Amino acid sequence: MEKLEKLNPLFYPKAVAVFGATDTPFKYGNLYMQAIIHRGYPKEHLYPINPNEKQAFGIKAYPRVQDVPEPIDLAIFTIPKKLVKQSLRDCVEAKVKFVSMFTSGFSESTSEREEGKKLEEELLEIIAQSNTRIVGPNGMGVYSFDGKISYPFMYHPPEDGPVSFISQSGGLTVELASMADFWCDIRFNKIVSFGNAINLESTDYLEYFAEDPKIKVINMYIEGVKNGPRFFKALKEAVKIKPVIVWKGGRTEAGSRATLSHTGSLAGSNKIWEVALKQAGAVQVYSMEELCDVTMAFLRIPPPKGLNTAILGAGGGRSVVSTDELESAGLIAPSFSPEIKEELSKIVPDVGTGISNPIDCSYFVYYDLDMYTKLIQLMDRDPKIDIILLQHEVMWGDRNEHLFKVIKEAREQTEKSFVVVLLPSAGPRKYTPELEAERLKILKQYLNEGILIYTSMHRASNAIYKMVKYYKFLELQEKPEEEVFAYSKLHKK
């Protein structure tokens, strides 16, 4: 609980001051005020700090933070770099708990790196003997659904979710919040964009979210860390409590150079990062899409007991490539048990079909939904199967709605991990924007019901495999060393 108490005022501030607040459109002091007010933060505890303004957004402005009538938990700097030092001194004098610095031009600046580093050191000297802590500089700051805090360009969904995002990039947090909500129905409870991290760093937020009962999955985008041993120690502890999904920036030589000019971070050796993340038990991803895919798996299905996956689809070629994609990702498509195979042979016609795994029933199965239901029930009964995966295409007429109802009921009746892959094929129809819109409508329908759904076998298989690997890692922490070695030899991915 110590970490929660330490950072709670940052995510649940009782009073907020915005340095540089103004009514002038398109200035960041204006945009931050807009975002915070739009998020619903109470105006009576929101204080514009600007000696050149009498008010902002109808709220009285103060020339100095020392002049406001209550203690400030969070100050947000949207001011020029030349004003930062004195403003920080004012915050220390006023006993402000946290200062979030959007201001840039520090060690990340290519043209002024040495000067920027020196300025960062001076900022640390200013807060050295105080309880004031810095988020940033060069970071967007904090989003907190319950704390009603936000920043410019941020998407504000009407509901929150059990996910947090720790990011060195501000722009990626804005992109992820919007994309994750639209495509995956993932929403965030808390986000922090911490930029150069001269004071508080990724490890502090990781420790906080590990203890936060509102957070079920932790997402991270990091380019580098100041204190590697401390970070990986915190990471090892966090993954014992909840999944931590890490997207590491700067993996290539060119990407590593880019991190230096983005946040002033040294990205470090990619191979060392890969090994260290694996040893810590983190789930490593390589894109925003993959981050969403894996997060969605953790939120929507119970932990699979193993890798064995039953596939129900249509088409011989599709069955072949689906199996290739599934096993290439690390999952397994085993043969069904003899008794289940016998039951399948009684149901599935023997022309143009197959009853191995995948089950290929050709397209007529979508017109015999009683058979479709029985096939799912048989897959569910097979003790060898851990995961049920159904793939289907956008259908004709009311077939989509009927199929959805059958799949929804089947999912409610199984305790196994249950996944749908929605393919784009138009069959005899020309693929048009209208057909893609229909596919999106179906996708959202499944998402709204809490069903795990992907748009390709590759994305589904990859996400689920990484989920299984995480839970296997947790299991192996309790097992003898020889069992751990045997597992690592079998699953080298």
Regions found by a protein language model. Give the residues of each.
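Catalytic-core regions of core metabolic enzymes
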Residues: 1-493
